[in-house]
Curated annotation (Swiss-Prot):
A lipid is attached at residue 313 (S-palmitoyl cysteine). It comes from the Eukaryota. Residues 62-70, 139-161, 210-238, 299-315 are cytoplasmic. The lineage of its organism: Eukaryota, Metazoa, Chordata, Craniata, Vertebrata. It comes from Mus musculus (Mouse). The keyword Membrane applies. Glycans are attached at residues 17, 27. Interacts with MGRN1, but does not undergo MGRN1-mediated ubiquitination; this interaction competes with GNAS-binding and thus inhibits agonist-induced cAMP production. Interacts with OPN3; the interaction results in a decrease in MC1R-mediated cAMP signaling and ultimately a decrease in melanin production in melanocytes. The chain crosses the membrane at residues 36-61, 71-91, 117-138, 162-181, 190-209, 239-264, 278-298. Belongs to the G-protein coupled receptor 1 family. This is Melanocyte-stimulating hormone receptor. Keywords: Cell membrane, G-protein coupled receptor, Glycoprotein, Lipoprotein, Membrane, Palmitate, Receptor, Transducer, Transmembrane, Transmembrane helix. It is a multi-pass membrane protein.
Length: 315
């Protein structure tokens, strides 16, 4: 953590330490290079918003027994993953601000250990977030294409085993990543994992969208409704699909592009320019943790009603 230019080192190895180990030409300066400086206050504000949102989601699902189903378990775990991202960002930003102000004084070794701990926490939450986004897509796919068998396929014991497995994989992978961040194979594994999740979500949601349009067409023909109604439904579905996948790609894509470029062109001036915007890529991931509750949780009327009761009781 630098006091001159605080690094939100989601895997600080990638932003500062790894640049020297991997030979990244981060000191090169080009007049055309676009660098976006991210204020600490923006990290802190967005992290706090995400923190509040995801805490509310976890409380609502925990409180309402009607929400104790596999689907909401996955949504709750996604909220916990995003919550870990928020806590990590808020904690690291607060420590940086306290160090800069001279309020907090700590040895370099202690700061580095804390930074590594936060890096593991953020990396683990990133992996788990991607996993739960993928498993939510699978759950929705099964609920549509295997509706009659859904409750026999997606059972609570299976859901719990999947949740435990994802958390264990996230912990192990984050520890290995921080330990072996110098090896390009580790970076390529992470990029491949992201592309696999992106492909999985795109295929499943596109198939669900196609089935929904076919279903709408059948209903329209059955009730002799106008063609424009079916087209309107399909356009609405296409917009929803575009927003869902678009937000996922825009928020997560730049960070994994950063990892890929570290492997492909570590010393190229254009890549060096992109490396300088690491904090912007991290901010987009925090933005994703802020948007996820709006997409996956708050659209549920049952959850919104529970949340309303919780807020009214708290007052």
């Amino acid at each position: 953590m630098s006091t001159q230019e605080p690094q939100k080192s989601l895997l600080g190895s990638l932003n500062s330490n790894a640049t020297s180990h991997l030979g990244l030409a981060t000191n090169q300066s080009e007049p055309w290079c676009l660098y976006v400086s991210i204020p600490d206050g923006l990290f802190l504000s967005l992290g706090l918003v995400s923190l509040v949102e995801n805490v509310l989601v976890v409380i609502a699902i925990t409180k309402n027994r009607n929400l104790h189903s596999p689907m909401y378990y996955f949504i709750c775990c996604l909220a916990l993953s995003d919550l870990m991202v928020s806590v990590s960002i808020v904690l690291e930003t607060t420590i940086i601000l306290l160090l800069e102000a001279g309020i907090l004084v700590a040895r370099v070794a202690l700061v580095q250990q804390l930074d590594n701990l936060i890096d593991v926490l953020i990396c683990g939450s990133m992996v788990s977030s991607l996993c739960f986004l993928g498993i939510i897509a699978i759950d929705r796919y099964i609920s549509i294409f295997y509706a009659l068998r859904y409750h026999s396929i997606v059972t609570l014991p299976r859901a719990r085993r999947a949740v435990v497995g994802i958390w264990m994989v996230s912990i192990v992978s984050s520890t290995l990543f921080i330990t072996y961040y110098k090896h390009t194979a580790v970076l390529l594994c992470l990029v491949t994992f992201f592309l696999a999740m992106l492909a999985l979500m795109a295929i499943l949601y596109a198939h669900m969208f196609t089935r929904a349009c076919q279903h709408a067409q059948g209903i329209a023909q059955l009730h002799k409704r106008r063609r424009s109604i079916r087209q309107g439904f399909c356009l609405k579905g296409a917009a929803t699909l575009t927003i869902l996948l678009g937000i996922f790609f825009l928020c997560w894509g730049p960070f994994f592009l950063h990892l890929l470029l570290i492997v492909l062109c570590p010393q190229h001036p254009t890549c060096s320019c992109i490396f300088k915007n690491f904090n912007l890529f991290l901010l987009l991931i925090v933005l994703s943790s802020t948007v996820d509750p709006l997409i996956y949780a708050f659209r549920s009327q049952e959850l919104r009603m529970t949340l309303k009761e919780v807020l009214l009781c708290s007052w």
